[in-house]
Amino acid sequence: MPTPKERPDFFTHLQTQKPRTLPGVTHPPLKITFLGTGTSSGVPMIACDCPVCTSPDPHDNRLRSSILVESAATTLVVDTTPDFRYQMLRARVKHLDAVIFTHPHKDHVAGLDDVRAFNFFQEQEMQVYANSMTIDALMREFAYAFADKKYPGVPNLRLNPITLEPFTVGDIAVTPIQVWHLKMPVLGFRFGDFTYITDANRIDETEKAKIRGSSVMVVNALRREKHISHYTIDEAVALVHELGVPTAYFTHISHQLGLHAEVDSRLPSGLHLAYDGLVVNV
């Protein structure tokens, strides 16, 4: 598989932040692309005329949350959102080795059917990594893909159950991190020095230990007001400071958080709102 190429025309309407490369890493260099940074309804939200949803700033346009993780030899995505097809087209993804799922909520799994395009061009099954709860949901919601007699053209999926034990996808080492989305266990993941967490409002101390030492982390920051199952922006900032991670990006953002430029300008040093198309090298 070819080395990931720069995509100079990817999100050319954005003033994209220069990718950050961290010194002293021992894992394969990774390129992280934020495919989407919005909450389940996306931004703009249907039928909403608030200042964020009508903002002309492209940073305020957010597809559902997902990232693309690339090494020189392996390409994977975390979650297949309802926007997955457009996210793959927009990022010009030509090869995909695997999908890793955080949890089975629809804004994280609904686009799974569209991996069949990769089945067609790569002529092989797609490797899917998920915990047992998510696998059960996928087999129910995409039952046609797992039928004994499949209709031609349905996704060809190989389900790989994962627990909290580390595993590898190609040359990328993955450490699962269990977080809590109210009462639902959700998986975050650490890839080398990079940690990705979405849909959380609580993390046990044993799992926080897996995050410590990361150079970059991503965590959800839904809005300012308290939420039953998501961190607020203030809670997310406090978590980053508690864990001592020097650089952090906030994702899974609602239109209720406010305008990107205004919120981002008020964040402490080293902390940023992520946006669709942002690239970070670790």
Model regions and ranges:
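Binuclear metal-dependent hydrolase catalytic cores
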Residues: 11-14, 22-197, 206, 262-281
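Thr-Gly-centered strand-to-loop micro-motif
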Residues: 176-177, 197-199, 219, 250-251
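Binuclear metal-ion centers of metallo-dependent hydrolases, dominated by the metallo-beta-lactamase
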Residues: 204-282
